[in-house]
A protein has these predicted regions:
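An alpha-helical interface "stripe"
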Residues: 1-140
Length: 140
C-alpha cells in the first residue's frame, strides 16, 4: 500500500513534470556511481558532448569540467561557484586550440537539447545518510 505522502505529494508532482516533458526514472535505475556522488556523471558527459560539439572539446577536457564540478564541497561559496558554472559554463583550456573555452552545462537556446529526469526516494550519503523525496536532474 502506498503512503499518503507518495499519493498526495510525490505522485502529483511527478505526473505534472511528466506532462511537461520530464522523464521519470526510479532511483534504483539512475546512472549513479555511488550514493556519495550527487551528479549523474554519464548523462552529464553525454550532455556536455551534445551541447558543446562545435568547440572541439575532447574527452580529457570533458573530464576536467566534470572534476571541477565534483571538487566543489558543501557551503555557500561552493554553491555560488556552481551557480556561476551553470550560468556561464566551466572554463577549460582546450589543448588543440590552445584557448580557454567555457564548457556549457545547459543549452539555454534549445531546451530540447537538455535531458530532464525526475526521480524519487533518492539516497545520498555525506556526513549523514539522507533520502530525498524528489530530485530533479537536468543533464545529470
Amino acid at each position: 500500500m502506498k503512503s499518503l505522502e507518495l499519493t498526495l505529494v510525490e505522485d502529483p508532482i511527478i505526473e505534472k513534470l511528466q506532462a511537461n516533458g520530464w522523464t521519470f526514472t526510479p532511483s534504483d535505475q539512475l546512472e549513479r556511481e555511488s550514493y556519495k556522488e550527487p551528479l549523474l556523471v554519464n548523462p552529464l558527459i553525454r550532455a556536455i558532448k551534445k551541447i558543446n560539439k562545435g568547440i572541439g572539446i575532447e574527452e580529457k577536457e570533458i573530464w576536467l569540467a566534470v572534476r571541477e564540478l565534483q571538487s566543489r564541497g558543501p557551503g555557500i561559496e561552493a554553491a555560488k561557484q556552481i551557480l556561476k558554472f551553470m550560468k556561464e559554463g566551466i572554463p577549460v583550456r582546450l589543448e588543440k586550440a590552445r584557448t580557454v573555452e567555457y564548457i556549457r552545462l545547459f543549452d539555454y537556446e534549445n531546451l530540447n537539447n537538455n535531458e530532464f529526469i525526475v526521480s524519487r526516494q533518492i539516497i545520498h550519503e555525506g556526513t549523514e545518510r539522507i533520502r530525498n523525496d524528489i530530485i530533479l536532474y537536468v543533464n545529470g
